[in-house]
Amino acid sequence: MRQSIFFMPTLKETPADAVAKSHQVMLRGGYIRQVTAGVYSYLPLGYKVLRKTEKIIEEEMANAGVVEMIMPHMLPASMWEESGRLPKYGPEMFRLKDRHGREMLLGPTHEETFTDVVAKSLKSYKQMPLQLYQIQTKFRDENRPRFGLLRGREFVMLDGYSFAASQEQLDKQFDDEKAAYLKIFKRTGVEVRPVIADSGTMGGKNSIEFQAPAAVGEDTIATNASGTYAANLEMAVSVDTFKQEPEELKAMEKVATPGCDSIDKLAEFLQVPATRIVKSVLYIVDEKKKVLVLIRADKEVNEVKLTHLLDCDSLRVAETSDLEELTGAGKGGVGPVNADWADEIVADKTVKGLYNVVVGAGESDAQFINANLDRDFRADRFADLRVANEGEPDPVDHEPLKFTTSIEVGHIFKLGTYYTETMGAKFLDQNGKSQPVIMGSYGIGVTRLLSAVVEQHATENGVAWPKEIAPFGIHIIQMKMKDEIQSKLAEDLEAKFAKYDVLYDDRNERPGVKFNDADLVGAPIRITVGRDAADGIVEVKRPGDDQAQKLAVADLEDFIANELD
């Protein structure tokens, strides 16, 4: 490809609103252009990277026995009503009505459609296991699109779905998809860590995220040094090392605590450590159930874990007005003693083994001291409900947890019968008995993956693309376009190495302009044809090299084969 006819509108300055390195590089290099907030055009350079990435996905999916197809973008809202997911998505869902007033939506994901079209077509166990996927544009009405392709309102995604007649089949499909995804990420050159994750609105109980460490990441992952534990912070578990020595139980006593509207103020006022205070947090669950959560005051409630425990669609911390109406106390005075108004009291495991603690007295500006579990207040059940802290021991090898910001580039789920039972997708098993199809769901954010690659492979002046998804494998730069010897050599090299996808800079531009643009193209090999062309010598440079090296043209073939084959 001749650069003189290749559409690559580069920018000299970084746009002020581009914060993420990947966003800066893709705008400056002419990979993408914003059409409106969260919506981008993929210019030739960006589209080449996108298509090469999709090709890798297609190859690895075929190797794993996963078959490609395509579903529509526009979906009837009735399918999502049938599955029960429509109200869970809220304002992020793009919704519209056709001329007949029928509710439609633009698909952010396609579990319902695959269940309706595919799972309902599977009548016998003999038709399974089955695995399908599509690469398609998705839509999500993000409140705050940002970071370029990392959080957009329109994006390209691989979404796959598996259908099984048994849990054993699903387990194998899940493992096969995980292995295929790891191969995809390796070939695209992105470092990922599979981590324990929350399934969120997708449903199901078991899921793994693929997280790419990056400074601009919106997620936090918790890992140990030996690599035996990794989890999204939302699901991370740590070992609580605090242990209170047993004490003789004292008589519970109410004390006034004026102005103590924080744990720090309360601890200072009562001259006790936060580990001797039990916080009481009231949650309104599914807008009807009142659940009081107890946790040691030096810890914070993990609402994702709480959602899993309560198996609810929504929860929120009670407003001050709710607290006053239910308990007669303000925020700091709510407590578990005589809390008969609570539908359920659940406690974090940190509450076990505490003696003579401070709890809210059920009225404003007052606390009970020397309160004790079972004697003075109850907990209906215990669970790990706390946010893990960095440095705490992991639950596997008891090594200190390290927190890293990261980008979620993939997510796989064991959905089970979450959709098929609701939507009536059943088959006959070996005994002729009707059973719901067992499903899995698998996704890679393809355009987000491109941003993650740039975040990890950015250079001072551009990007060093991994060889399999680089827009061009070789970038030939001719110094003087009027030099016939240079032109002849550059054209010969372009033809000889055409299979590596060559970009030949034949523009009549200054060397500085050409080299700056070459940094943004980020080809694995840059060949400069200059003053030594008459002697059969060129300069070659890889993105990681400090300096270009001179190389005889006769040695180029072996050098390139060693780098790119």
UniProtKB/Swiss-Prot annotation:
It is found in: Cytoplasm. The keyword Calcium does not apply. The keyword Cell division does not apply. Its EC number is 6.1.1.15. Pfam families: HGTP_anticodon, tRNA-synt_2b, tRNA_edit. Its main location: cytoplasm. GO terms for biological process: prolyl-tRNA aminoacylation. Keywords: Aminoacyl-tRNA synthetase, ATP-binding, Cytoplasm, Ligase, Nucleotide-binding, Protein biosynthesis. SUPFAM superfamilies: Class II aaRS ABD-related (SSF52954), Class II aaRS and biotin synthetases (SSF55681), YbaK/ProRS associated domain (SSF55826). InterPro entries: aa-tRNA-synt_IIb (IPR002314), aa-tRNA-synth_II (IPR006195), aa-tRNA-synth_II/BPL/LPL (IPR045864), Anticodon-bd (IPR004154), Anticodon-bd_dom_sf (IPR036621), Pro-tRNA-ligase_IIa (IPR002316), Pro-tRNA-synth_IIa_bac-type (IPR004500), Pro-tRNA-Synthase_IIa_type1 (IPR023717). CDD domains: ProRS-INS (cd04334), ProRS_anticodon_short (cd00861), ProRS_core_prok (cd00779). It is an enzyme of class 6 (ligase). GO terms for molecular function: aminoacyl-tRNA deacylase activity; ATP binding; catalytic activity, acting on a protein; proline-tRNA ligase activity; transferase activity. Belongs to the class-II aminoacyl-tRNA synthetase family. ProS type 1 subfamily. This is Proline--tRNA ligase.
